[in-house]
């Protein structure tokens, strides 16, 4: 009986080790778990220097997701650098709604009825892989399906109702305090700022190695 008991104990111990190994193999390692938490990769940055009225208020730096939405990012970068002979420099943010978003990019008319892309007047929605997860996400403004031009908006809250309707392509990495200053500027009954909100300078910042950011 003693030998049988010892044998049973050995079998049970071996079985426990096997089960433990299986559980260990099934559980995701730290790198896998972290990968699931990671969001899109920033491949390039763009900066805007803001002025409200005559007062400089600071710089906003955007991280753009060139692997997820390359065509949309290329458009935004080219308009920021002005490499095509037109773009965002000296244009205004024409629409500001507190607890929602701030909108700009109409460098032709300045009132939300103009603007154009580097591909022509309008270009199609690239994809809707990314969502409006929270404050600071940058997305294309449009007048309906496949009507992207140059206008864009920066969220100041989570705006889930826009998911699947507007192409998200970037996020504020630095300068969210500047976005808040713009968000809190006084506006008229049509959401136009009473003092001009101007992009006095803008450009591109290279990224040596793409990096992921959280979806928040």
UniProtKB/Swiss-Prot annotation:
Superkingdom to which the source organism belongs: Eukaryota
Sites bearing N6-acetyllysine, chain numbering: 165, 209
Subcellular localization: Endoplasmic reticulum lumen; Melanosome
Molecular functions (GO terms): cyclosporin A binding; peptidyl-prolyl cis-trans isomerase activity; RNA polymerase binding
Any GO CC annotation of this UniProt entry: protein-containing complex
Listed name of the protein: Peptidyl-prolyl cis-trans isomerase B
GO annotation, biological process: bone development; chaperone-mediated protein folding; neutrophil chemotaxis; nuclear transport; positive regulation by host of viral genome replication; positive regulation by host of viral process; positive regulation of multicellular organism growth; protein folding
Catalytic activity: [protein]-peptidylproline (omega=180) = [protein]-peptidylproline (omega=0)
Gene encoding the protein: Ppib
Organism of provenance: Rattus norvegicus (Rat)
Leader sequence residues: 1-33
